[in-house]
């Protein structure tokens, strides 16, 4: 069996590499992976994450996490994981030049980008899009897509991770080649599922659409990512994906519990018990000692949350180093949170969240709204794309940003154009557009 090599895995080559006139400035002030991080922070799609719901509806009187705050926190945890792993690898491979910040910067940048392809209304937005094409009005276009050679599975299993890879690599109308022109290492770190929708099976998870398949293959070849299967192609995970995934798992699971407490969905006793279950006996005793000096319950929860995140971060960093040989051969495929000593506590917290948090009325209402809003917008835009000469169609398409190619010829291309447009919306923009095109909110009212 083959093995991946850190020499080739850490590469600052960029997609559609730009010609630089300031190499000395860039090498002196920022390395290439720091440029990736900064490029995303200053981008419009990243800013729009501030008005995309994580789990709970926005805005509210109690400030809970949105996609932006979540991504920033994941990036912080990812950086810490990168530092832990760098320290361990430097000891293990003394001859290799593991630069102090490269892995941490790559993981941190990838963490920033991991949710940039998600549509409005949280994960319910992904489910709403998939349901529309699988069992809703969108099913009527399946025969047309397949007869044209398109990949229908890309839509009935719509995946925000694949959409993030498209957003970062696709050349939208009027934009530069290579999308964000990020480094190959940062882009590879985003692809949690290194295969297309043809290999997704019943998991409904995949890493790239048919339109970006060649782009990922190019990146994989340059970095030396192992190919595990041909036709359809399945690759081993790029090693740093495990760190990005762990950072996301740690943050969303722990922060969802804290948000649920702030919204009074769960009690102080429940959240503190769940947080304590992640800690060993010694840490529990230390935590209780500190908690005696804290009167404010919100501050108590915040303190426990910080201890748990720190504890899980260290555990996942150690797990990566333990399983690194199997990761490098593509044999290890489990999330890091599933192989740490705290795995059972993670499972218990996840079960609790699904039973008591993700079924809360506010969360369910967001999902119901998402289904209705997406169905209406997709239907109207697809009608406009299919019949562009109609008066209503011309009016509707005039609202669409010029970066989206409304002149796509194939049905697959028209659907993808529609989903590019919708997934770039914020929650408020999607809701406002829905109200306007249905006449619920008239501009002169």
Question: Could you tell me what each predicted segment is?
Answer:
Residues 2-18, 425-445:
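Structural signal for terminal/edge beta-strands and the immediately following C-terminal loop/tail
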Residues 321-402:
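Substrate-recognition/cap regions that form aromatic- and gly/pro-loop-enriched pockets
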Residues 394-442:
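C-terminal amphipathic alpha-helical interaction region
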Residues 57-66, 110-113, 149-150, 232-233, ...:
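Glycine- and acidic
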Residues 35-47, 338-345:
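Acidic, low-complexity proline/glycine-rich segments
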Residues 73, 242, 246-249, 308, ...:
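Charged, amphipathic alpha-helical oligomerization/scaffolding segments
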Residues 1-29, 41-52, 61, 72, ...:
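Sequence-structural signature of the catalytic-core scaffold of metal-dependent phosphohydrolases
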């Amino acid at each position: 069996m083959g093995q991946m090599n850190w020499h080739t895995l850490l590469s600052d080559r960029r997609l559609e590499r730009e010609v630089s006139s300031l190499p000395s400035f860039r090498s002196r002030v920022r390395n290439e992976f720091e440029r990736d991080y900064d490029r995303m922070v200053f981008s419009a799609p990243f800013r729009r994450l501030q008005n995309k719901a994580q789990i709970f509806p926005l805005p509210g009187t109690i400030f809970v996490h949105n996609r932006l705050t979540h991504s920033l926190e994941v990036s912080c945890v990812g950086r810490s994981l990168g530092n832990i792993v760098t320290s361990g690898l430097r000891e293990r491979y003394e001859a290799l030049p593991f630069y102090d910040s490269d892995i941490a910067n790559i993981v941190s940048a990838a963490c920033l980008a991991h949710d940039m392809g998600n549509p409005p209304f949280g994960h319910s937005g992904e489910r709403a899009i998939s349901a529309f094409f699988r069992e809703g009005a969108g099913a009527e276009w399946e025969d047309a897509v397949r007869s044209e050679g398109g990949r229908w599975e890309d839509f009935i299993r719509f995946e925000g991770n694949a959409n993030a890879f498209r957003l970062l690599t696709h050349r939208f109308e009027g934009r530069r080649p290579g999308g964000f022109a990020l480094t190959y290492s940062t882009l590879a770190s985003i692809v949690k599922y290194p295969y297309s929708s043809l290999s997704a099976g019943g998991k409904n998870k995949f890493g790239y659409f048919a339109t970006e398949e060649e782009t990922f293959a190019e990146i994989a070849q340059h970095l030396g990512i192992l190919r595990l299967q041909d036709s359809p192609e399945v690759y081993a995970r790029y090693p740093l994906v495990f760190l990005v995934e762990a950072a996301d798992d740690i943050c969303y699971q722990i922060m969802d519990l804290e948000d649920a407490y702030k919204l009074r969905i769960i009690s102080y006793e429940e959240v503190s018990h769940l947080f304590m279950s992640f800690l060993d006996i010694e840490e529990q005793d230390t935590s209780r000692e500190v908690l005696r000096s804290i009167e404010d319950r919100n501050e108590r929860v915040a303190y426990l949350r910080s201890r748990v995140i720190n504890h899980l971060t260290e555990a996942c960093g150690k797990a990566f180093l333990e399983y690194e040989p199997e990761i490098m051969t593509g044999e290890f495929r489990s999330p890091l949170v599933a192989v740490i000593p705290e795995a059972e506590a993670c499972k218990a917290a996840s079960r609790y969240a699904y039973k008591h948090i993700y079924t809360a009325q506010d969360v369910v209402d967001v999902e119901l709204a998402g289904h209705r809003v997406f169905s209406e917008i997709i239907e109207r835009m697809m009608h406009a794309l299919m019949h562009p000469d109609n008066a209503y169609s011309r009016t509707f398409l005039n609202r669409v940003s010029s970066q989206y190619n409304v002149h796509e010829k194939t049905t697959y291309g028209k659907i993808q154009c529609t989903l590019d447009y919708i997934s770039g919306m914020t929650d408020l923009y999607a809701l406002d557009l829905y109200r306007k095109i249905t006449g619920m909110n008239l501009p002169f009212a």
